[in-house]
């Protein structure tokens, strides 16, 4: 496992077209879960890792809420994510996972098969004001910009996570234990901006999901995140 002792996070969740989301996960043997109105759930999460077992780095995850193909999705997928990890069928398929160090990139790709690449990532969280940027590694221009001030919110827990990924032709299910309080907020002025000229695959996927100039449904933020990324288990 990889241990993360002292970290910050800004996570924004968006309701996106379910057919467009399904097109991005079908080849991995996964199916999207639908929320109210038949929409799929996509997340953009910016992380600032200040103390981990593999060093200091920043990371951004773009992911879609899914279950393995053929699995009956819960009627209320968001509520189901409050279950214990062993009983939670709903997880996230990571589409892109840029990081700022080669060590973090190698670990994620070699152990879990995560779609990591190395590029600069800016992270600034001051109160409820956030500014985060992923740089296009090819053009060195902004690929993704998430910024704004979160709206009214309440204290709450950070959710434990289930992650699905393909590794060595198998489907891995990985549990992520989290600890530390967060603020769960309305989106306020938070917006995602995607480069309309970048040809990088991450930019193409973000645009395909309709996340250019998108407003999240809600956001989580915290300066007290701790987590444990466990070894993945191959599903039968």
What are these regions (language model features)?
Residues 36-39, 67-72, 87-92, 120-121, ...:
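Glycine-rich loops and low-complexity Gly/Arg-rich segments
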Residues 40, 58-60, 126-128:
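A generic structural signal for short beta-strands and their flanking turns/coil linkers
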Residues 95-236:
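Interaction-surface and assembly-scaffold signal
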């Amino acid at each position: 496992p990889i241990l993360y002792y002292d970290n910050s996070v800004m996570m924004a969740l968006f309701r996106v077209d379910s057919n467009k989301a399904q097109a991005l996960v079908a080849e991995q043997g996964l199916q999207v879960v639908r929320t109210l109105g038949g929409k799929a759930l996509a997340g953009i999460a910016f992380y600032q890792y200040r103390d981990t077992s593999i060093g200091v780095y920043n990371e951004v995850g773009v992911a879609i809420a899914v279950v393995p193909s053929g699995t009956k999705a819960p009627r209320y997928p968001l509520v189901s994510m409050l279950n214990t990890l062993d009983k939670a069928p709903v997880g996230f398929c990571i589409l892109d996972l840029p990081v700022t160090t080669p060590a973090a990139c190698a670990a994620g790709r070699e152990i879990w098969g995560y779609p990591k690449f190395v590029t600069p990532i800016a992270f600034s969280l001051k109160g409820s004001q956030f500014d985060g940027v992923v740089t296009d590694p090819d053009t060195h221009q902004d690929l993704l910009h998430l910024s704004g001030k979160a709206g009214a919110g309440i204290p709450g827990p950070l959710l434990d996570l289930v992650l699905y990924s393909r590794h060595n032709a198998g489907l891995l299910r990985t549990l992520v234990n989290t600890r530390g309080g967060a603020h769960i907020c309305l989106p306020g002025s938070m917006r995602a901006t995607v480069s309309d000229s970048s040809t990088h695959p991450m930019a193409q996927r973000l645009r395909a999901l309709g996340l250019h100039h998108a407003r999240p449904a809600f956001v989580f933020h915290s300066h007290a995140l701790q987590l444990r990324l466990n070894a993945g288990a191959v599903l039968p």
